[in-house]
Amino acid sequence: MQENRPVIALDFPEFSDVKDFLEKFDPSEQLYIKLGMELFYTAGPQVVYYVKSLGHSVFLDLKLHDIPNTVESSMHVLARLGVDMVNVHAAGGVEMMVAAKRGLEAGTPVGRQRPKLIAVTQLTSTSEEIMQNDQKIMTSLEESVINYAQKTAQAGLDGVVCSAHEVEKIKAATSKEFICLTPGIRPEGASKGDQKRVMTPKEARTIGSDYIVVGRPITQAKDPVASYHAIKAEWNR
């Protein structure tokens, strides 16, 4: 099922930046917010509690990648924060991903729904050349992504983070219900930044993405609220 709200990546260094940004929006508007490593390492759980207290959904983007026991215990803790989605690196392997899900299930308070758990396949900043030269994965980028997606599905996770360019083949290799969350989304004419594989909101919708993540085109816009609504309208067109 496609989420009708673009996920806003709040890649800010300070908690105060989050407050300043969210205060621009009408209090009645429920957003879907992505909180990443830098912000969580700086502000800790309080930033999650704050965003949730405003009625927004939270994707906590920490990309866990460690031994299974460590990931399981970490997910047990993260589940208590009330987040709506978390992630791991698929490169950690099936055993690690199974442990992550087990930790989430055990840590989710009674009466609450377990946070969605997705895995990163290849980062959108990774080109095939980088993958082959640095990671020594000597397949095509597409083959690597599909393999990771299949391993993620095998582990029982809800979906993957992937480029919109791979969505159709991932769903064909897993299932239509398998979530594809796609970063690297840029409105027509926007700068690509450090993203190698990008797509517009309209293109991502057409190709079957379930969630899109948009950061700088919203957070660095002259009018973030107007930019958000324009991207949301394009995504839902």
From Swiss-Prot:
InterPro entries assigned: Aldolase_TIM (IPR013785), OMPdecase (IPR014732), OMPdecase_AS (IPR018089), OMPdecase_bac (IPR047596), OMPdeCOase_dom (IPR001754), RibuloseP-bd_barrel (IPR011060)
Pfam families cross-referenced by the UniProt entry: OMPdecase
Residues reported to bind substrate: 11, 34, 61-70, 124, 186, 195, 215-216
GO cellular component: cytosol
Enzyme class: lyase
Domain of life of the organism encoding this protein: Bacteria
The EC number(s) this enzyme carries: 4.1.1.23
Functional pathway: Pyrimidine metabolism; UMP biosynthesis via de novo pathway; UMP from orotate: step 2/2
Keywords on record: Decarboxylase, Lyase, Pyrimidine biosynthesis
Catalytic-site annotation from UniProt: 63
Keyword Lyase listed: yes
Gene Ontology molecular function: orotidine-5'-phosphate decarboxylase activity
CDD domains: OMP_decarboxylase_like
HAMAP family (UniProt xref): OMPdecase_type1_B
Family listed: Belongs to the OMP decarboxylase family. Type 1 subfamily.
Annotated function: Catalyzes the decarboxylation of orotidine 5'-monophosphate (OMP) to uridine 5'-monophosphate (UMP).
Oligomer status and interactors: Homodimer.
Protein name: Orotidine 5'-phosphate decarboxylase
